[in-house]
Amino acid sequence: MNPANYLILSALLFTIGTVGVLVRRNAIVVFMSVELMLNAVNLTLVTFSRIHGTLDGQIMAFFVMVVAAAEVVIGLAIILSIFRTRRSASVDDVNLLKY
């Protein structure tokens, strides 16, 4: 498959993730949209790595996946904390954590 197709797919995935972050108010959906954006970046890194014949992009994609795994743990803990106190997973309730 042509590498340009992978880059187009990556741009499409990133755009869908961006729209999800900007439009949705549910914290879980926003969180999934951010993960979709990270996966789009991973696809771009691996595609450029494949084009240039090096492993640098694949190694960077691996580190992005490790950081995303840590983000999942911390993000879900914060969302769970908000849900337990407000019984809602809306991002409008984020100011709750100030107190």
Curated annotation (Swiss-Prot):
Keywords: Cell membrane, Membrane, NAD, Quinone, Translocase, Transmembrane, Transmembrane helix, Transport
Keyword Cell wall biogenesis/degradation on entry: no
Molecular function as annotated in GO: NADH:ubiquinone reductase (non-electrogenic) activity; quinone binding
GO cellular component, one term: plasma membrane
Reaction equations catalysed: a quinone + NADH + 5 H(+)(in) = a quinol + NAD(+) + 4 H(+)(out)
Membrane topology: Multi-pass membrane protein
Subcellular location: Cell membrane
GO biological process terms held by the UniProt record: ATP synthesis coupled electron transport
Pfam families xref list: Oxidored_q2
EC code: 7.1.1.-
Transmembrane annotation, as ranges: 3-23, 28-48, 59-79
Primary location recorded for the protein, binned into one broad class: membrane
Subunit and partners: NDH-1 is composed of 14 different subunits. Subunits NuoA, H, J, K, L, M, N constitute the membrane sector of the complex.
Family designation: Belongs to the complex I subunit 4L family.
Purpose of the protein: NDH-1 shuttles electrons from NADH, via FMN and iron-sulfur (Fe-S) centers, to quinones in the respiratory chain. The immediate electron acceptor for the enzyme in this species is believed to be a menaquinone. Couples the redox reaction to proton translocation (for every two electrons transferred, four hydrogen ions are translocated across the cytoplasmic membrane), and thus conserves the redox energy in a proton gradient.
The protein, known as: NADH-quinone oxidoreductase subunit K
Gene that this sequence comes from: nuoK
